[in-house]
Regions:
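Acidic, proline/glycine-rich short linear motifs
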Residues: 38-61, 141-154
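A conditional alpha-helix N-cap/helix-loop micro-motif detector
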Residues: 16, 58, 83-84, 112
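Aromatic/hydrophobic pocket-lining residues that form π-stacking "cages" and hydrophobic walls in ligand
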Residues: 23, 65, 90
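Glycine-rich, Arg-bearing micro-motifs that act as flexible, cationic patches
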Residues: 103-126, 137-142
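Structural beta-alpha unit
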Residues: 1, 71-102, 107-110, 120, ...
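Small/aliphatic-rich secondary-structure junction motif
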Residues: 2-50, 72, 125, 135
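Conserved hydrophobic residues forming the short capping helix/wall of the S-adenosyl-L-methionine
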Residues: 27, 65-69, 94
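General small-molecule cofactor/ligand-binding pocket signal
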Residues: 35-37, 77-82, 131-133
Length: 155
């Protein structure tokens, strides 16, 4: 019987190349499948839908991680959720998918891929198994045009 190890990488905003690269390296080193969870926040008002920019960023994130994972030989499972409560959804999905842990990326005490307050809420929950990935101070923000030009050249 093969035991599949899963690590959950949650995302709410701010595509960061170095964060994604480090999460993929962690999954590779542990022989784990990376469950890539993109959370799209729903507005509190029921007559409003999610922002188009949030949906587009979610799609970009999932595609970018899929591409990087394929190049590094890491298995990924993509999940996109629309939610009013991102942290609660992270907890629930981690348990539902039997993830060995949740990958949280930070830079200088600030959340990366998640808002800082979301990272803090997850850190406060002692029931969760967490993998904290610290990044160096310099930022490596995602540039869709640059990524697309590299991707098309590589095909």
């Amino acid at each position: 019987m093969v035991i599949m190890t899963r690590l959950l990488l949650p995302f709410t905003h701010g595509i960061d190349v170095s964060a994604i690269t480090r999460a993929l390296a962690l999954a590779h080193n542990l022989g784990a499948t990376l469950v890539v969870l993109s959370l799209i926040r729903l507005p509190q008002r029921p007559d409003r839908g999610p922002r188009w920019e949030d949906i587009q960023q979610s799609n970009d994130f999932l595609e970018f991680v899929q591409h990087k994972a394929a190049r590094s030989g890491v298995l990924v499972e993509r999940v996109e959720l629309y939610t009013h409560h991102p942290v609660g959804s992270i907890r629930a999905l981690s348990q539902e998918m039997e993830c060995a842990g949740i990958v949280l990326v930070v830079r200088r005490g600030t959340g990366v891929l998640l808002a800082t307050h979301e990272v803090k809420q997850l850190l406060e929950d002692q029931r969760l198994s967490l993998y904290i990935v610290p990044l160096l101070a310099e930022a490596s923000m995602f540039s869709l045009p640059r990524w697309l030009s590299h991707w098309f050249r590589g095909r």
